[in-house]
Amino acid sequence: MDNQINEVTIVGGGTAGWLTAAFLVRFMNLRNKDNPTKVTLIESPNVPTIGVGEATVPTMPALLKSLGISEKEFFIRCNASFKLGVRFTNWNHDDKGRATSFIHPFEAIRTQLGGQNPAYHFHKYGGPQGRKNLDDCMAFCGSAIRAKLGPKLLTHGDYESKLNYAYHLDAGKFAEFLREVSIERGVNHVLDDVEEVEQDERGFISALKLQRQGRRPVELVIDCTGFKGVIINKVLGVPFRDYSKYLLNNRALAVQIPHQDVRQIEPCTNSTALGAGWVWRVPLYNRIGTGYVFSSHFRTDDEAREEFLNHLGDEVKDADPRVIPIRIGRMERAWEKNCIAIGLSAGFIEPLESTAIYMIDNFVKLLLLNFPDKSFAPVLAKRFNETTEKMMQTIRDFIILHYCTNNREDSDYWRTAREEMVIPDSLKDLLEEYRHTLPINTDFDGVYLFNYFSYNVVLFAKGYLKDVQYPAERFIAREDWDKRMAEFIRYEQKELAGLPNHYELLRKIRGEDDIPAQHSGASFGGFNAAAFGAQPGGIQIPQATVQIGAGQIKPSIKFALKKDKKQETEVDQDDLSGSHIL
């Protein structure tokens, strides 16, 4: 009896479904043309994808390259732009009550200094004038972002660059692009509705009954049906592990707005904190995607809409943001019997750090590494589930970090996020470690995306460590740090020299001509004076600031729920366009 799985059936489209299809059809059959595995994707023609997510992380270029996708064509088809990092504004306040700002960059100089982590030097001596954050002293991205530079030279080809980068993209167009690529490479596309799911005596999925095409036997099923989790949750009964005790937000407003001047397009995502959540701003080539992620415990939909539109001000006229309910958490097991959940059906962590496509990518790679035969050895599912659980937990912890280290006193939302939400033991232990030493990657149990530098950037920018006295700082010298900073600035100038304006680079990639972008300020090696440490203007909020200490975190939550009737309406969706916003 043939024990080999001959067909993989994906249920659901969107970014999750089509990225899975594109990955499987390429890597299962690229070296196996004589005995290819059939890939079928079934999606409903009646349930539209809710397109929200429009940003990625710096693993994305390698993913597209591995899929054999032309980067130039991707930019044109998806109205993509470059992303060099995320700017966080108003998540904390300084000692005068003013909003602070920092950038989480995509690269860093990680060499030691005098046998020690150079972050100790920054902690003890601070940065040079105009470089008040750690990212200004160990990464070039902030300078490039402030000067609105692209990461490539005009002469660079696909996937070549001087700086690490990710993309902003139109999620709907990206899913369409992946669909075309997948079908061209042999994916069988079925437009139909799944009406019934059959199970055998073991509880395995044996067949899908389609509305128009009838019964369809299956061997291995990939559930990409979004928040509904049609197969993994509703049929197989895998429980959902709710993260609401850790993270408050459960709603989002989304709207598209035009560029005021496309020539000034920023190569970064912006995350600006408001009274009950935060606003994302993702600049595509042809428009800006923006929205408000908030908590219904502190704002009704109407209140959030008013706050959001007031924040946007003159940029919006007669805008009607759509409301998107979001469910934060994960399935207890992403692999159950002969079904594997990928995308929203597996789980969704608040989209603050653009991690959804990254998770889809890693889930599919793990499937290929643990690909079963028809016996479905339990050890494979066990390994897959343990690894994906750890991956999602590490992302969850890093998202929580942004909230539990805030020092805002101007709203109940921010006080609750800091003082009453549960902090996982894994993050508690790490924060306690940071009170005594600055960890390195070996201290992180399974580094997936956010390593010690990411944690350092956030904790230093928020002032969480400013009162800590590190024993290791006895062994460092100011002269070493001053020399390193002088070398760093010279190296930064060299690396950024010749990099074009972001808009001009996008026009070059797309093969278009237009008026050159307007540059302002003095030029240093091809980029503006603003690149040298000048901080973007923050939101001035006259509020008191409190110092956050580890002892102030409380593992409980008590607040009154605030609802309106509109919040009871569910939005039907197969996917959330890759389930990422940032």
Q: What spans do the regions from the language model cover?
A:
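N-terminal Rossmann-like FAD-binding beta1-loop-alpha1 element of flavoenzymes
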Residues: 7-34
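Glycine-rich FAD pyrophosphate-binding loop
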Residues: 27-52
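Dinucleotide-binding Rossmann-like beta1-alpha1 core, especially the glycine-rich loop
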Residues: 48-144
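Predominantly flavin-linked oxidoreductase catalytic cores and closely associated redox partners
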Residues: 157-159, 163-277, 283-291, 295-304
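Conserved FAD/dinucleotide-binding core of flavoprotein oxidoreductases
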Residues: 273-325, 345-358, 370-373
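FAD-binding beta-loop-beta segment adjacent to the flavin cofactor pocket
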Residues: 324-341
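Long, low-complexity C-terminal extensions of enzymes
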Residues: 369-521
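Long, low-complexity, intrinsically disordered segments
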Residues: 532, 536-582
